[in-house]
A protein has these predicted regions:
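Signature of extracytoplasmic/envelope-associated structural regions
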Residues: 2-245
Length: 245
């Protein structure tokens, strides 16, 4: 039978689930599930002050205050739903708002323009729209009336798209509050078997700082979520739970 003196090792990353917070402060319906995390870090910090006195003005009594718990999640993959939650494109219930649209703007580098057709990089032929306002030529020697045959030009067109998902980021919307539960495994020193372990955070605030890195070299981009743990309406700020399946 397990005791509080049993020791365990931790190596595996967490799988994380975000939940709505109900009106009575309990954990509600799931909003987002993450099972592709690379790193999941829970950090607790606090400030400290002490009463000093006597010879050498040494510390006599110490107080801790301003406790903060933060969580950092580094995800190898993203979805439209996870980006919407990270950037604050959510409704009143904290659910992601991802719109659909039928048209998108594309700018192409054009090597030839002839009879309304252009040859795109990669050999794909594309017919330019003829409606006024849908094509804009950026090269000085190319216009809609006298296209010519420039060495290169940039043409911006409105095209019909497929399976488009659009995330609108407004100046007055920010990421919301959620409950968060992280699931992982810890390994017993005695048996060598893995046992289930949970980090339960009844109330966290998704931080607004988001960095989206697009680069040609190096490792694939990861997507970071930074959470600040808040005090819930009832109960502790965080629970660490070991259990057997």
């Amino acid at each position: 039978m397990a005791t509080i003196l049993d020791r365990y090792g931790v190596k595996e990353v967490m799988d994380g689930t975000f939940y709505q917070i109900t009106e009575d402060g309990n954990i509600g319906a799931p909003v987002l599930y993450l099972d592709s995390l690379k790193v999941s870090t829970v950090e607790q910090t606090a400030e400290n002050t002490s009463a000093r006195g006597g010879k050498g003005n040494v510390e006599l009594v110490s107080w801790d205050f301003n406790k903060e718990i933060t969580v950092t999640l580094e995800d190898a993959l993203f979805s439209a739903k996870s980006l919407a939650i990270m950037y604050g494109s959510v409704n009143a219930n904290g659910e992601a708002v991802v719109d659909t649209t039928e048209t998108i703007y594309r700018t192409f580098r054009v090597d030839q323009i002839e009879n309304g057709k252009v040859q795109l990089r990669g050999g794909k032929e594309f017919t330019l729209p003829t409606e006024e306002g849908k094509v804009k030529y950026y090269a000085a020697d190319v216009t809609a009336s006298t296209q010519g045959a420039p060495e290169a030009a940039y043409v911006t067109v409105v095209v019909d798209g497929k399976s488009i998902q659009e995330i609108d980021i407004s100046p007055d919307t920010f990421p919301g509050n959620y409950a968060f539960v992280g699931d992982t495994y810890i390994r017993s020193e005695i048996t060598g078997r893995d046992e289930a372990f949970q980090v339960i955070l009844p109330k966290v605030k998704m931080q607004s700082e988001v960095t989206l890195t697009l680069e040609a070299d190096g490792d694939p981009t990861t997507f970071n979520m930074n959470l600040k743990v808040l005090r819930p309406a009832k109960g502790p700020m965080m629970k660490l739970v070991k259990y057997d399946l």
